[in-house]
């Protein structure tokens, strides 16, 4: 399963869960599984561990090497029985449904260009991108962007002439 499809940790109660990844989604999924009673949670990282002092039944290990039967075997030789494997391996923004002139194209995810207040597309005020910032106050930022967007749609906030503003 990919973290994109993760909805409820309840289904992992009493199970040995292996989480592959070492960023926000992996942390969230691993802790949810632990909180809802997973028998064990093993977090496999590829580059750097998250480095937290994990609760009992949670462990970080270096890089999955292979799967054999129902075991996850890691590069350091550690083996963990796996009832479930959850991939928290990141994602790429992809907008195949938009024409090229409307697609956000940037490697800068801290403050993407051409988005007024980080949301409204400069060349078309009816197009709004939410959640484009990369891992910076993520969920608080999503909430703020949703409220801002709501107020723009309800015409409580007026968008200035963006052709006069360098974004």
Q: Where are the language model's segments positioned?
A:
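Conserved small/polar residues in nucleotide/adenosyl-binding loops
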Residues: 166-167
